[in-house]
Amino acid sequence: TAIVRDALIQRFEFTFEAAWKAAYRWLRARGNDVDEEAAAVIPEAFARRLIADEKGWGDMRRFRNKTSHTYDEALAMQVAAFVRQDAVRLFEALLVTLRERSA
């Protein structure tokens, strides 16, 4: 339903924010002077092998930017499909890597 889809998108938005900020804190804790913005953190996280799919994370950032500024039914359907097909996997991979490399 539309309500479930909208809830999925909202959870995606705040999960994306939490994820890139966790990557930012991990990078900073290890002496990296990266700017506190997703556009800077994503490539640096990729360079440091914190994430493996830079394109997927870039897609997430673009979707997050689009969903926060406007509502569009076609975009909502596209984002919901992306979350199901890709975003969950990307978030889980980051979580595993953070746990492994922070132990």
Kindly give the residue locations of the regions a language model identified.
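Solvent-exposed interaction patches of small proteins and small membrane subunits
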Residues: T1-A103
